[in-house]
Design a protein with these regions (language model features):
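Phosphate/diphosphate ligand-binding glycine-rich loop within oxidoreductases
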Residues: 2-118
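Short, conserved loop/helix-junction motifs that constitute active-site signature segments
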Residues: 3-4, 122-123, 145-147, 219-228
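Glycine-rich adenosine-cofactor-binding loop
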Residues: 14, 105, 124-145, 155
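Short glycine-rich anion-binding loops that position phosphate/pyrophosphate groups of nucleotides
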Residues: 66-73, 134-135, 207-210, 237
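Conserved S-adenosyl-L-methionine
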Residues: 145-150, 250-253
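NAD(P)-binding Rossmann-fold cofactor-contacting core
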Residues: 148-176
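Rossmann-like adenosine-cofactor binding region
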Residues: 178-254
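Adenosine-phosphate binding glycine-rich loop
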Residues: 228-230, 234-289
Length: 289
């Protein structure tokens, strides 16, 4: 489809963005469905995020994705936030609804959909989630809103981000009281073992397992891995982290992180266009080994 005066524009903003596969994935999907959209990427430093979003609004862009480091700043630029975005305090997607900028966070919904695609439904389940950074917080909030029964959050007490986890627990207790939420020190192996004993799923939402930490795992002892426990990792490079390799060897079902990347993009696509991304074709084209 040729670009015309009617073509709606979308983009990715953040820094760096040159490596991003988003433009290829979205433009392929638009072409596949015959939609008159184009998707670009702009390298925008955190301090310029507000100006960039104002410019996109002025030029009537349909919306944008935000990657690091501007996710928190971007939330403050919106006229309205989804419930998950309000509680997370950050966004990765803005949709321009006739001049009103609506902020969304699709990281958590992408993770939930990835779990579903691997046969795991979080509803009514107990989840143990390590990590209190942006992705971890988004997953914890989305899981609480999505019907998880209990969420045990683990983070290193010595880290400044432990306070993020405490704040997430407070928000879940206040806004989603039907979901039990607690936080523990990740360096307390006994607490981790105890919480895993009756958990349904463990998720690594830290950078452990990613290079240069690809020889490490957040689970210090493989005896904590019982076959009934599902293991999820948000790290997608390498595709099979040490955590997932050891979990598989212990007879556990594993959920690799690459699917979360795909499904968070698919959710943003739906918000932009009102249509479903051609996920199977995109998966084959851009996410196959």
């Amino acid at each position: 489809m040729e670009i015309s005066g009617h073509t709606r524009l979308l983009c990715l903003i953040g820094s760096p963005v040159a490596h991003s596969g988003s433009p290829a994935m979205y433009n392929y999907s638009f072409e596949k469905l015959g939609l008159d959209y184009r998707y670009l990427a702009f390298d925008i430093k955190e301090e310029d995020t507000k100006k960039a979003i104002e410019a996109l609004k002025m030029m009537n862009f349909r919306g944008c994705n935000i990657t690091m480091p501007g996710k928190t700043v971007a939330a403050s630029c919106c006229d309205e936030l989804s419930k998950a975005a309000q509680l997370t305090g950050a966004i990765n997607t803005i949709v321009n609804e006739d001049g009103k900028l609506v902020g969304h966070i699709t990281d958590g919904t992408g993770w939930i959909r990835n779990c579903l695609e691997h046969g795991f439904d979080i509803h009514g389940k107990k989840l143990v989630i390590a990590g209190t950074g942006g992705a971890g917080t988004a997953i914890q909030i989305a899981a609480a809103l999505g019907g998880a029964k209990k969420i045990a959050i683990f983070a290193r007490k010595s880290s400044p981000r432990f306070a993020n986890g405490e704040e997430t627990v407070r928000k879940i207790r206040e806004h989603v009281p039907e979901c039990q939420a607690e936080i523990f020190d990740l360096e307390d192996a006994e607490s981790l073992r105890r919480e895993l004993t009756n958990a349904d799923l463990f998720c690594n939402a830290t950078k452990v397992g990613m290079k240069p930490m690809d020889d490490q795992s957040v689970i210090p002892d493989v005896s904590m891995m019982r076959p009934e426990l599902v293991f999820s990792d948000i790290v997608y490079n390498p595709r099979e982290t040490k955590l997932l390799k050891e979990a598989k060897e212990a007879g556990c079902k594993v959920i690799p992180g690459i699917g979360m990347l795909l499904w968070q993009g698919a959710e943003a696509f739906r918000l932009y266009t009102g249509q479903e991304m051609p996920v199977r074709e995109v998966q084959e084209q851009y996410f196959s080994e």
